[in-house]
């Protein structure tokens, strides 16, 4: 996967209200959503707070992310994250009928079409029958993975 890296883990989406200094020098309270790789809700909150060290921050919510796989791009133009829903297609061994398994990915890309192209690239290399069901933009600002930070 040239320029792409898949990372599997247990992810949490953490929403926080953060006081940040704007370009004009004014301070403003903004809501941000970050993704944290963690073992529990408490661990996710602790890691998010550590990343916001030095800021006035309140954690608003912590929820289990609907994905276990994050697809990162090394392209500097890929500055957003998208959720992509995919259905894997396989025959049911007992009935022989088509069986579909839904999976959600978080994909770093510059556009919706590029996110879907990245999914296609990964799935073709995996040689799995699939269909892309949906893709939507997210408000994710950053992904914190065991010592690494992917900022947008």
Task: Locate predicted features.
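Short amphipathic beta-strand and strand-loop transition segments with alternating hydrophobic
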Residues: 1-3, 61-74, 137-147
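Short aromatic-glycine-(Arg/Gly/Cys) micro-motifs in beta-strand/loop hairpins
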Residues: 4-29, 76-100
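Short, structured motif recognition centered on aromatic/hydrophobic residues
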Residues: 10-16, 33-35, 44, 48, ...
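A cross-kingdom feature marking solvent-exposed beta-strand/loop segments within repeated
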Residues: 20-36, 46, 54, 97-105, ...
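A short, charged, amphipathic alpha-helix used as a generic interaction element across diverse proteins
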Residues: 40-53, 111-127
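Short loop-to-beta-strand transition segments
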Residues: 53-63, 125-134
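Short, solvent-exposed interaction modules
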Residues: 61-125
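Glycine-rich, aromatic-bearing surface loops/beta-hairpins
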Residues: 126-152
């Amino acid at each position: 996967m040239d320029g792409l890296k898949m990372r599997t883990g247990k992810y949490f989406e953490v929403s926080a209200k953060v006081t940040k200094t704007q370009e004009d020098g004014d301070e403003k309270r903004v809501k941000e959503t970050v993704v944290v790789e963690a073992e529990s809700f408490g661990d996710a909150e602790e890691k998010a707070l550590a990343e916001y060290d030095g800021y006035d921050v309140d954690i608003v919510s912590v929820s289990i992310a609907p994905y276990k796989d994050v697809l990162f791009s090394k392209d500097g133009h890929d500055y957003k994250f998208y959720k992509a829903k995919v259905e894997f297609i396989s025959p049911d061994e007992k009935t022989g009928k088509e069986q579909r398994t839904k999976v959600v990915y978080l994909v770093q890309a510059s556009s919706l079409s590029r996110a879907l192209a990245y999914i296609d690239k990964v799935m073709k290399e995996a040689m799995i029958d699939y269909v892309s069901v949906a893709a939507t933009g997210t408000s994710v600002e950053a992904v914190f993975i065991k010592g690494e930070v992917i900022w947008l």
